[in-house]
Amino acid sequence: MIGKTNALSAAGVELSLVVSVTSGAAVTATKSGKTVTGTATGGSCVLKLPEAGTWSVSATLNGQTSNTQSVSVKDSYAVSLTFFSATITVTVDSGASVALKKDGATVQTKTSTGTAVFTVTETGTYTIIATKSGQSVSGTVNVVSSTTTYALTLSFVSSTLNNNEWSVIKSVSDAGQGASYWSIGDRKAATLNGTVGALTLSNVTTYAFIIGFNHNASVEGANRIHFQLGKTALSGGTDVALCDSKYNSQVSATGYFSMNSSATNSGGWNSSQMRTKICGTSLSSYSGTIIAVIPAALRAVLKSVTKYTNNTGNSSAASAVTATTDYFFLLSEYEVFGSTTYANSNEASKQAQYSYYSAGNSKVKYNHSATSTAVRWWLRSPRAGSSAAFVIVGTDGTVGGRNAFYSLGFAPGFCV
């Protein structure tokens, strides 16, 4: 604020410039090579100016420079100067050492009490690094305004998979370090809400479980943790597949958990209604698919995966095995059993058995809404010697086949 006083200038009379600024600040006024300085006490500094005219006024304190005011002094004037100040609140585990850095240099260090609050005196990008028990996490904050309060949450990795946010799981996956923290079969809760195909789910909590770390990475993509849905509990419980009201029945409409609406495997996995309408192929348009019913936090960290499958259908040719890019996918015969009985045997050259199943874990799954009832569940591999069927896992956990228009159990995989 600049204010004019009632004092009048006269020849040989000094003009007063009253500067309101933080106590201890060094105040400087300059004009055409002339400089007047002073130090603020009690929140202000009075400068005696030798002449009228336009003066530039600024202040410094603890290495910080205030805004600069340009004042046209004819009489005596008052001006206010402010220093830039913004707050960054970091939420992180109590006891963590939190360092604030800018341009590679450490600006401040604090110990978190659940939060660590930093006051910064200039704009720019700040890096915050929290360290506890030998583990470090970091994030950045871009400070552009003194009127904004900035916040950052940092999370350490827990060795209990379910205690981690999906974003933390992704960061571990990005670094290719999943196996350093967790084990095959570890579980993470996911609450399903909405409609997938013809099945409406309301607050149904299932547990996604890890089936592979960097599985078949040279083909499918590196730095991925592979999961499958789902189990009924964080420990113990039952392996389940989602089943709609037409389970084990023939259906002639799309939208049920059938591979197709007719008894055909033409076009294989790539063209199946299971892939396009139930699993979904896009993160921007996914209404009615499994992508629509998973938590938003999981949807935000999904990674695409390259899957090779017989995408012709009734074929044993190597050329029939081609790639698709998927977010949710059915497992193949080889990925579950480590061998091919009904699928095109050339699929095996582009696939690998998932660690979860190679370890001998059960392949039997139960109806998610009737957990004492074992169900058949779909695999994405077409039966190579049939124009009508895809491969399935039977109620006893053995491999089989079923015509594509049957609605069966849905137990998809995905990657983070």
Task: For every predicted segment, state its role.
Residues 1-16, 82-85, 146, 155:
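Short, low-complexity N-terminal tether/leader segments at secretion or assembly junctions of large
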Residues 40, 60-84, 131-158:
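Structured interaction patches on ligand/partner-binding surfaces of diverse proteins
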Residues 13-23, 86-92:
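A short, amphipathic beta-strand motif
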Residues 47, 51-63, 118, 122-134:
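A short, solvent-exposed beta-strand micro-motif common in secreted/extracellular proteins
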Residues 31-46, 103-116:
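Short, acidic Ser/Thr/Gly-rich low-complexity loop/linker segments typical of extracellular
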Residues 157-416:
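Collagenous Gly-X-Y triple-helix signature in extracellular proteins
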